[in-house]
Swiss-Prot record:
CDD domains: ABC_KpsT_Wzt. GO terms for cellular component: membrane. Transmembrane segments: none annotated. This is ABC transporter protein AbcA. GO terms for molecular function: ABC-type transporter activity; ATP binding; ATP hydrolysis activity. It comes from the Bacteria.
Amino acid sequence: MSEPVLAVSGVNKSFPIYRSPWQALWHALNPKADVKVFQALRDIELTVYRGETIGIVGHNGAGKSTLLQLITGVMQPDCGQITRTGRVVGLLELGSGFNPEFTGRENIFFNGAILGMSQREMDDRLERILSFAAIGDFIDQPVKNYSSGMMVRLAFSVIINTDPDVLIIDEALAVGDDAFQRKCYARLKQLQSQGVTILLVSHAAGSVIELCDRAVLLDRGEVLLQGEPKAVVHNYHKLLHMEGDERARFRYHLRQTGRGDSYISDESTSEPKIKSAPGILSVDLQPQSTVWYESKGAVLSDVHIESF
């Protein structure tokens, strides 16, 4: 096994919840005063090895973005330790690392400086960045006038050209159009072949299964499951559709066993409410909604659905 480039051990992170700005001021003046606290992350353990691609999944509010912000050093944990090796570069919140008053070209050098690159190094990479971003003359306009899609084009183009050892992406690619997303995923695969370690947060199950070597399921600030991406995504989807006691039992089962395939739900032990309809096959049936697209060289064949 290759050497670890990232180790998260016993990490906790919480945030105070204030009823009013006055309470926030009072707490700032009296740090020991009692306030309500939201526990965003609890006892996180995660080791990432060189060249791995890790997918992190979980519902909104599970703690995914908080974990990535801790890993990149944007925030510090309440307790625990995070060890990093090499250059860690992240694409987190849209527009982070950019000055809205600067032009796109100025922000390339500004963002590069934040990431530890010299002006000469960024000069050498400028043409590659402009070519990948493909935003034309807008590169010399202030980024405050950019659309979200243009912003992510420029941000992604910068970070992939800063020689990262660890690349962290937090759902930002979902903003781009389909063509740009395909270009980004092709570039990520190229970085994988070069041994770059990638942490990817995405709600796109297909992307996690296709790109990642391992997946992590975060829920309510806890790591419930780590393992093969297809199995982790499957259990994540099961968890999404559970509520109340059933959800609590499944979470406990995942924590204790590290797998969800042996779990027996309440519904599986009861009689089905709806009986399956008999199958009908007719070769003469022709769908009226079929849409044919111009071929671009890719052919899909033997399309079928596999059960988990």
